Amino acid sequence: MRTLRGRFLALLVAGLATGIAANAASAEAPPADNGHNVILVTLDGVRVQEFFGGMDPVLAKAPEAQSGIYDAEVTSKRWWRETPEARREALMPFVWKTLAPAGIVLGNQAKGSKVTVRNDQWFSYPGYSEILTGQAQPDVKSNDLVRYPHRTVLEYARDSLALSPTQVAQVGSWDGFKYAASSKDGAFFMSGARDPVPAALSTPEIDLYNGLRQQIQQLWEESSNDVLSYRIGIEYLKKHRPRVMWLGLGQSDDWAHARRYDLVLDYLHLADGLIAELWQTLQSMDEYRGRTTLIITTDHGRGRTPADWAEHDAGIPGCQDIWIAILGPKTPALGEAHDFPDVTQGDVAATMLQYLGLDGRDFNAKARPPVPRSLKTE
């Protein structure tokens, strides 16, 4: 009996030890890479009014001194339609005719879908920080071009999936984007408003677009032309096949601050076309087709009235209201969200990670959860 009991105890201890070792190895092992890709596109300071309703009837009727519309007849002919649905389809046809039927569009409060920022600043850097870290960061209170010690979803994805520095990328038209993208210099490929692309990573096309980007005059020193930034991003994507990429576009905010509502509308149509081309490019490449999610959002809203629509800060109602659009093979085709749980800007980070097979809680315990119902259930 003692011999059998001793053998039993020895086997039991050995089994427990094996189980503990296996659990420890499992806990230490990196998550399985599901091979999915995520592309984040941000359009700076785009209001819910235009995104969901096209040309705003309030601003369409406002005096030129408030709207900045240079030729009301021309602008109305381009963008005015009788219904909000017709106006938004004319303004952003890819979003409303391609993305919305196959994906999710959130933020139309008239239909019971609310997306808001949680930071208390309501301008750019705090918004991008909230998007990329999953939470409002109390110490981010300016647009100063500095890095903060908050790990971003881009850094976490690279580390967790053991991606190379070229497989995570940020390309944008404002220098603030490259600072918001990472807590550390050189964590992955980052390109600001006029940064030259290193020769080892560049192509003749990238060199051409970057040279033009240096020459074209912009409204603000810290920004560059969105079309050229987009072209650099597309060429980088074709050459290096990043798994995670953030493309930051900013001229929507530039034209709004210049109080040129007509040019804001023209720009949104242009940006929609660029995003459509991006999606078509992704579908033409084996590495991306059927395995890529596109997420589009904005950093803040703007004022709601003719007097304050051009501006944004914590004292202007409406600047907290934003939107999110998602398209991809893992996203259910919910369309324009109706009677939907409230969503915040910080939900974007964990939403990106869920498509990559990662858990936002491991990234940042204080991060917001993913957008509800944004992942297909098998």
What is the predicted function of each stretch?
Residues S183-D185, R231-E277:
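Active-site His/acidic residue clusters
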Residues I39-L40, V48, L270-E311, M352:
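Metal-dependent active-site segment of extracytoplasmic phospho-/sulfohydrolases and closely related
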Residues G53, P57, W79-K239, R368-R373:
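Active-site-proximal alpha/beta segments of enzymes that process anionic O-linked groups
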Residues R78-A86, V140-D144, V264-L265, W309-E311, ...:
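Active-site rim elements
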Residues L9-A21:
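Bacterial N-terminal signal peptides
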Residues L154, R158-L161, D339-P372:
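Non-catalytic, well-ordered alpha-helical segments in soluble enzyme domains
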Residues A62, I296-P329:
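Histidine-centered active-site microenvironments of extracellular/periplasmic hydrolases
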Residues E28-I104:
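Active-site-proximal N-terminal segment of extracellular/periplasmic enzymes that hydrolyze or transfer
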